[in-house]
Amino acid sequence: REIGLIIVDEAHIVTTWGVGFRPDYWYLGGYINRLRNQIQTKWNKDKKVAHFPICAFTATAVNGGLDDSVSETIISLYMENPIKYIGYVKRDNIRFNISVRKSNKLANPVYEEKKATDLISRINEWIAANTKTIAYFPYASYAGDALRGIKSFAGKTFDRDKVALYTGRNLDDVSTAVLAERKRKAFDEFRSGEKPVMLATKAFGMGVDINNIVNVYHYAVTGNLC
């Protein structure tokens, strides 16, 4: 049976997360190239050169500029003169609210204390209003500190029974099975609304289909915005 079409969903992963998180995406271009350039020899006369189109879809790839992941993906997948369809990227139902804390030196104790205080204040507001919210952290340890109320978050109170935690790291050094069960439980509690606030890293995002999330809070500027 010959291949008629290859569809690559979440195509930005080919050149971003593909290296360490989704290796199948990283090697996909090489596999496609081998399929298209198989050589017939006396030992494999049945081999045929495969001719098929490739469709790649993504909602988050950057087109142009220093972080041009669109061009990188085209090169990685060995796409020749592809036709690009770029949709309307502005989401009219999304509003950005940026809070800037002035400090002579970033990441000093006073600065971190202010950031933590701001976040806890917002968490209490979200819990009181019962608005489903994801608070993203650059590191799993920060998310864990916030939930446990330690380091910059020491002495700050909120209803921890209303807050879930989901990161890609094993913060408590538990078994793989226990960690997987904790993640599943956190996801279910957040989706059902039992815990309306989720403290997470980018590990919580892919494949999450929850249509009533109201707020997405970034504790630090994301890498793509730096």
Which residues are covered by each model-predicted region?
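Post-DEXD/H (motif II) to motif III coupling segment of the RecA-like Helicase ATP-binding lobe
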Residues: 2-5, 10-86
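A short beta-strand-to-loop transition that corresponds to the Sensor-1 phosphate-sensing loop
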Residues: 10-11, 56-65, 137-140, 200-204, ...
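Catalytic phosphate/metal-binding cores of nucleic-acid and nucleotide-processing enzymes, i.e., regions
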Residues: 15, 26, 30-38, 90, ...
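Conserved strand-helix element at the start of the C-terminal RecA-like helicase core
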Residues: 63-65, 123-153, 164-167
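Conserved helicase motor
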Residues: 88-89, 137-142, 163-184, 201-205
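Inter-lobe coupling/hinge segments of SF2-like helicase ATPases
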Residues: 91, 95-113
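Conserved RecA-like helicase motor core of SF1/SF2 enzymes
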Residues: 168-170, 189-226
